[in-house]
Amino acid sequence: MANWKYQTTWAGILTSWILLGALLVFISLGTKKMENDPKGLQNLLEFLWDYIRDLARTQIGEKVYRDWMPFIGTLFLFVFVSNWGGALIPWGLIKLPSGELGAPTADINTTIALALLVSLSYFYAGLSNKGWRYFEYYVHPTPIMLPFKILEDFTKPLSLSFRLFGNILADELVVGVLVFLVPLILPIPVMFLGLFTSAIQALIFATLAAYYIGEAVEEHH
Amino acid sequence: MDSITSAASVVAAGLAVGLGAIGPGLGQGNAAQGAVEGIARQPEAEGKIRGTLLLSFAFMESLTIYGLVVALVLLFANPFS
């Protein structure tokens, strides 16, 4: 562990702020003139809203899903926009003095921050909904489960962050290697595959976050 | 980095991805088999089956990706160098 230094990653912060700004503009444009018969952008946003609501409702349950829908939706949209923004916007054209711009989620700091947010929120969801009875979950079927359940609290953010980080980085690396070997045409299908997997990873991140929150608020009988 | 550490790191990086790909490969094969059987039995449920299949594929794939992360750490951010 000799030369692991703390490094600030301005490139990741910069791209995530740019993408967040784009997302904000996109959503405020879509909700500016709301009509009864949605069309165009408003239609798309309503479709997204429905999608996120269904996701939250199936994972968290009818009773409390409304409290957590904004969080799940934010996670989904942020991860989705980061993944696609990193792949679709030609960041390579912008030269930086140090580091390079790319998908914010290809940076381990971003994904660990998101995963820790998920951890905090499922603890908060459990404690605020059930009080101290939340800790019954740790000894739920039998007290033998206690060490495993405690270990799970550490592996959840670990797997959540590494899954997202690894997938996005792997996409970028595969495209990079292919562009290095065959610069023409051949990388294009792989790029589409990358877009597809990044969309699925955003969905998985949001689904798992919702599932963990749902697990914490679930009533045992 | 001395040569024995770098050699061991490269071998370990290869093994991490290679061995990590075995389990998820078998798992994805099983899942695809189940999905094909399901579609053959009930062609009208194809859309639902495909969605679930892709979601579970991504879960299995992430196991190999963990191996890839370990391999990348060994190659580019080796803690023992």
From Swiss-Prot, chain B:
It holds the Pfam family ATP-synt_C. GO terms for molecular function: lipid binding; proton-transporting ATP synthase activity, rotational mechanism. Its main location: membrane. SUPFAM superfamilies: F1F0 ATP synthase subunit C. Coiled coil: none annotated. Disulfide bonds: none annotated. The chain crosses the membrane at residues 7-27, 57-77. The keyword Transferase does not apply. The record marks 61 as: Reversibly protonated during proton transport. Keywords: ATP synthesis, CF(0), Hydrogen ion transport, Ion transport, Lipid-binding, Membrane, Thylakoid, Transmembrane, Transmembrane helix, Transport. It is a multi-pass membrane protein. One of its GO terms (cellular component) is proton-transporting two-sector ATPase complex, proton-transporting domain. Gene3D superfamilies: F1F0 ATP synthase subunit C. It is found in: Cellular thylakoid membrane. F(1)F(0) ATP synthase produces ATP from ADP in the presence of a proton or sodium gradient. F-type ATPases consist of two structural domains, F(1) containing the extramembraneous catalytic core and F(0) containing the membrane proton channel, linked together by a central stalk and a peripheral stalk. During catalysis, ATP synthesis in the catalytic domain of F(1) is coupled via a rotary mechanism of the central stalk subunits to proton translocation. Key component of the F(0) channel; it plays a direct role in translocation across the membrane. A homomeric c-ring of between 10-14 subunits forms the central stalk rotor element with the F(1) delta and epsilon subunits. PANTHER family: ATP SYNTHASE LIPID-BINDING PROTEIN, MITOCHONDRIAL (PTHR10031), ATPASE PROTEIN 9 (PTHR10031:SF0). F-type ATPases have 2 components, F(1) - the catalytic core - and F(0) - the membrane proton channel. F(1) has five subunits: alpha(3), beta(3), gamma(1), delta(1), epsilon(1). F(0) has four main subunits: a(1), b(1), b'(1) and c(10-14). The alpha and beta chains form an alternating ring which encloses part of the gamma chain. F(1) is attached to F(0) by a central stalk formed by the gamma and epsilon chains, while a peripheral stalk is formed by the delta, b and b' chains. Belongs to the ATPase C chain family. This is ATP synthase subunit c. It comes from Prochlorococcus marinus (strain MIT 9301). The gene is atpE.
